[in-house]
Amino acid sequence: MKSSVAQVRGSNYDKVDTRSSSERSSSPEDSNEERSPSPRDRGYSNRSRDYSDRDRYEDRSRSGRYDRSDESRRRERERSTSPRDRGYTDRRRGYSDRDGYGNDRSRNGRYDRSEDNREREKRQNYQDRDYEKRSPPARRRSPPARRSEEQTEEQNQTEPPVKKKKEELDPILTRTGGAYIPPARLRMMQEQITDKSSMAYQRMSWEALKKSINGLVNKVNVSNIGNIIQELLQENIVRGRGLLARSVLQAQSASPIFTHVYAALVSIINSKFPHIGELILKRLILNFRKGYRRNDKQLCLTSSKFVAHLINQNVAHEVLALEMLTLLLERPNDDSVEVAIGFLKESGLKLTQVTPRGINAIFERLRNILHESEIDKRVQYMIEVMFAVRKDGFKDHPVIPEGLDLVEEEDQFTHMLPLEDDYNQEDVLNVFKMDPDFLENEEKYKAIKKEILDEGDSDSEGDANEGSEDESEEEEEDGQEAGTEGEKMTIHDKTEVNLVAFRRTIYLAIQSSLDFEECAHKLIKMDFPESQTKELCNMILDCCAQQRTYEKFFGLLAGRFCLLKKEYLEAFENIFKEQFETIHRLETNKLRNVAKMFAHLLYTDSLPWSVLECMNLSEETTTSSSRIFVKIFFQELCEYMGLPKLNARLKDVTLQPFFQGLLPMDNPKNTRFAINFFTSIGLGGLTDELREHLKNAPKMIMTQKQNVESSDSSSDSSSGSESSSDSDSSSSSSSESSSSSSDSDSSRRKKHSQKKKKSREAHKAASKKQAPDDRRKEAPKHKHQKEKYDDKQSRKSKRDSKN
């Protein structure tokens, strides 16, 4: 078996080896070649050779011999040189003793190695081959030039390692917050710069200005705002107006609770430098529009709150507020309504004072949103709270808080900036820019600063003097008052807190009662003062009016109180008169409930029928609401009592003086109106007497006219007799003086009296010939004609008596 395997391997070797047997020789050198081991046995691994079949190669090297020529042997020797001699360095292979590489070979060219070393190198070769298969094919490179170790060591010693140097940056030119410069070093740097118009000095002054403005704005509050303003004016805020605007807006957005303080600060600066106030307002408007477009509720809330306080300080015009509210409520959602309500709370009182029509339109829009729009419950409650705040007069949201009204009205400057205009927020003012006229501008601002601060000092001194004088005068007046008046001051509470609590207690007692007797018992047990009696009756009536339909519970409760005390009875009588006079203020449902309750009180005789004295049925004295009230009132009475009993009660002789306005008979026009009214509501049976009176009115007028004429004639005759007696007395006195003059006077008087009698008879005859139709037409005006006639007759009688 072994011999066959050896034969197979030998045949394969003959096929692989391209060199023929003719190339081999049997020279003495072949013996040396036989003794020389194969390259594999010498431990070389040349990558240029391909040892594809290592086992067969080993067998050939052991059994077979090479027969090569001189040229082939020379090539073999060149190939068999060490890797180090060929200039290759393989780091994965370890040559522990490179210098002794040549000593390992014996004189006959063989290595003296043990079997273990061969196995170790075999494993190393297999690992190298596997690694080369796994790694990607590398691009072939030419072998590097061979260098000696001495040359490489000398080169390493002559070339030291090169280190990269970091470029040192000027701390002044770094961005904000990038580098901290201690104050001492900053002063030293400023002292070193001699040219104050240079860019470095301007840069340092800009950084100092930025830090100063930012620090002062962050420190401002109600107590120190005056000092902060003076320190701010010490800085060049004209040059740093962009920094000031940015600091104010950032501080306000970070702490919105101090918005009123920042608004007062802006108001003071705006009075001295209006262009700075305009810049801040422009940026605020742009921030609001940006937040509205991005649906950023927080940005809209902060910016709108700042705008509201600037409107209160008269920095911005109220038209801007109306435009913002209109925009927010045009297409309402939860966030926009919330922003609008926050804006209204801050500026509602100012808008109410300045533009009441505009604020009414805004609240009407809010009412429509509350009833029609589908919004969240929380937002609905916010709208209701807003209406309550408006009803209280914005008492928790004053226009300008105490201590911040620091600008005189004549010094205020109001900016008219619409919401929809295009504005430039001038962001270039926020960054440093070299000023070629730096020194001139600094001198100009120093002059402005001196003027402003001098004015402020004079104003403060004047205010201090005036304040000291006022304080001295007040002290003197207080001393005089303390000496003259030793009485204690009484404080009157006009907030009606107790009244609200009392009404709440009554309402809860009414709502928690099962029947009217239990409710009356609870209310009587309450120890409330007598001054609250009318308020109790009003509360019962209000609770009745608030119901959807009339409940008999309230009529029985009111009747029980009317029967208990006379004070309650008088209170309900006064309430009936007040309600009838102001009935036009009630809605139809409330009006119906009130009318039915008072009808119940009259039907049960809890109230006297004398309360109907306030009703006066005529076209001039009634309104649509009062006519509806009377209609429901009498229909309810007719339903309770029936028409016969009601008619009998209205015809009661003892009550007729109280029904003269309800059933008028003084004027046919009013009588006809009352008849038509009761007939239209289905109670025509109550107007029988009125109809008879209207039919008999002409006859009564005729008789009254005749009686008046007879009384006039009797009065004329009595006046004539008086005049004759006067003439007789005068004639008797004149007869004593001269008899001739008395005769002439008596004859004249006789002729005059005869003419007067004839004229009276003719007047009576003419009056009897007048047609009855004319008398009927003149019947309504008879009273006025009678008065005119009496006046004429009295004047004639006086003239006759004089004659």
Curated annotation (Swiss-Prot):
Q: Where is the composition biased (Polar residues)?
A: 1-10
What does this chain do? Answer: Required for pre-mRNA splicing as component of the spliceosome. Promotes exon-junction complex (EJC) assembly.
| Keyword DNA repair (UniProt) | no
What GO molecular function annotation could you give as one example from this UniProt entry?
Answer: RNA binding
User: What subcellular locations does the record give?
Assistant: Nucleus; Nucleus speckle
UniProt lists compositionally biased (Basic and acidic residues) regions at 12-22, 33-135, 787-803
Keyword entries, A-Z: mRNA processing, mRNA splicing, Nucleus, Spliceosome
The annotated region (Disordered) lies at 1-178, 451-490, 703-803
Comp. bias intervals (Acidic residues): 454-480
Q: Which GO terms describe its cellular component?
A: catalytic step 2 spliceosome; nuclear speck; nucleus; spliceosomal complex; U2-type catalytic step 1 spliceosome; U2-type catalytic step 2 spliceosome; U2-type precatalytic spliceosome
Ranges of Low complexity compositional bias? 709-744
Identification of the protein by name: Pre-mRNA-splicing factor CWC22 homolog
Query: Record's SUPFAM superfamilies?
Result: ARM repeat (SSF48371)
Q: Which InterPro entries match?
A: ARM-type_fold (IPR016024), CWC22_splicing_factor (IPR050781), Initiation_fac_eIF4g_MI (IPR003891), MIF4G-like_typ-3 (IPR003890)
